[in-house]
Regions:
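Gram-negative bacterial Sec-dependent N-terminal signal peptides
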Residues: 1-6
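N-terminal small/polar-rich segments of proteins
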Residues: 7-84, 108-150
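Residues that form or immediately flank small-molecule/cofactor binding pockets and catalytic motifs
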Residues: 40, 97-99
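Short acidic/polar mixed-charge low-complexity motifs
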Residues: 60, 86-88, 100
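Predominantly extracellular/luminal cell-surface or secreted proteins
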Residues: 67-69, 93-97
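Extracellular/luminal ectodomains and secreted, surface-exposed scaffolds of diverse proteins
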Residues: 76-77, 88-94, 102
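Surface-exposed loop/edge segments in extracytoplasmic proteins
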Residues: 100-106
């Protein structure tokens, strides 16, 4: 046989499996909630709102809840920043809607489903009407923990 006939091009092939697992994940960014300034003669309900930014894997259901060291589920307490332990604390609550239908507590909260993009959710803080009547002058604050379960 001529040498040119033996040097023919040859090929081989194989199948390669490629895989990827996308796991569910979420991130949460919270902004501060500020009730602003009010006199102790404020007789109407006080509302303030803020946003939280949530990013969850597309199709991932999540629940946003809130807890505090105050020990009560759903009622949080603004405490004097000057450390006066004898001063009145001011009760407040957190809601997922302006109409106050969905309260955010340690066991119940805002339910939604992630879409893979940032979802801005508005939260509403509420102080009941007349709650400042016996409050001492000063700055009050509270720290709560927002938890995203998914």
């Amino acid at each position: 046989l001529p040498a040119a006939a033996i040097a023919a091009d040859s090929t081989a092939s194989a199948t390669m499996h490629v895989s990827l697992e996308v796991v569910k994940s979420c991130t949460l960014k919270a902004n501060d909630l500020n009730f602003s300034r009010h006199g102790s003669d404020e007789s109407s309900e006080i509302q303030a709102k803020t946003q939280v930014d949530i990013v969850c894997t597309n199709g991932t259901p999540f629940t946003l809840t809130a807890t505090s060291n105050d020990g009560e589920n759903g009622t949080f307490w603004l405490k004097p920043e000057n450390g006066d332990t004898g001063a009145q604390k001011i009760a407040w609550k957190l809601f997922a809607d302006e109409g106050k239908q969905t309260q955010i507590t340690g066991t119940n909260g805002l339910d939604d489903t992630g879409n893979g993009a940032e979802q801005e959710e508005t939260l509403y803080g509420v102080i009941d009407a007349g709650a400042l009547t016996t409050a001492q002058a000063g700055t009050y604050s509270d720290d709560i923990t927002l938890k995203l379960e998914y």
